[in-house]
């Protein structure tokens, strides 16, 4: 049989799959995960201000009954436009966040603090919390560490 178009996502790799933790069948207790944060990760979010990044998100997941308590620690070096010259600047970031989820109920977001995961959900998707952590960690002033690292052509206009 011949198809006129390919099925959705045919041949595409799910770049965000490594950021999902299956919790069904996971034993109670503490579990540690290490997730690489790379340029492909941020390319998956079209609204991202970050051009590129290299780093690690360490997740400490505590499963207690039907509760999942995840602490996300992100350490990375991100590339984004310098506020002074618009050339790419590399900036180190660090951020810690906590994600709490309860399983077994309808999917809702309670006060933005606790996620309720329905019975059909079998994995905790941490891609969005990691993405948000990276953006929360960005400094308000995004410039090269040394002014002489700025693009000299643009710096000439500012002088």
Locations of the language-model features?
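Acidic and generally charged, gly/proline-rich low-complexity regions
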Residues: 2-159
